[in-house]
Design a protein with these regions (language model features):
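Beta-rich catalytic cores
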Residues: 31
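Mg2+/Mn2+-dependent nuclease catalytic core
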Residues: 52-71
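Acidic-basic catalytic patches of nuclease active cores, encompassing PD-(D/E)XK
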Residues: 1-26, 40, 147-149
Length: 151
């Protein structure tokens, strides 16, 4: 069960065969994403971790600015917690994801370029990958740079 971003980090670390993750100390440079990843294709990427109980995702102004300035290779992983109570309001969505209170955790991966939509519309924005399991997100991140020429 995921209760906070630390639990999301632990799940990601445990599930991410083939990807090396380094956790970044964010107090040094505000807005820098939580993780630096390096996959089996020798591709670096960043990952901002977010946990929410409803559709709204909270970002600091520094995080928004960072994602606006960085393009490909910067991602946001949002998890909607199963710890929603009966009073939590969630909007109906067309993409992958359960919406009932008390339902399972769902994972959503977004590109950096989607940051302004995420601030405005939260999880109503279609993810590039999403679902009940984190495996598909790991598969996507592991595939980054697969078509790039190797040295």
């Amino acid at each position: 069960m995921i209760k906070n971003e630390r639990d999301l980090w632990k799940l990601l670390k445990k599930s991410s065969a083939g990807i090396l993750f380094d956790r970044i100390e964010n107090w040094a440079v505000p807005g820098v994403p939580d993780l630096l990843g390096y996959n089996q294709n020798k591709t670096f990427f960043t990952l901002e971790l977010k946990l929410t109980k409803a559709n709204k995702i909270k970002f600091s102004p520094h995080q928004v600015s960072w994602h606006l300035r960085h393009g490909p290779g910067a991602f946001i992983l949002a998890a909607r917690s199963m710890n929603r109570d009966k009073n939590t309001t969630v909007a109906k969505m067309q993409h992958v994801g359960g919406l009932r209170a008390g339902g399972p955790t769902h994972f959503f991966l977004y590109e950096s370029r989607q940051i302004l939509d995420l601030v405005a519309r939260g999880l109503k924005v279609d993810p590039i990958v999403g679902g009940l399991r984190i495996d598909e997100i790991i598969k996507f991140l592991n595939g980054l740079g697969a078509n790039a020429p190797r040295p």
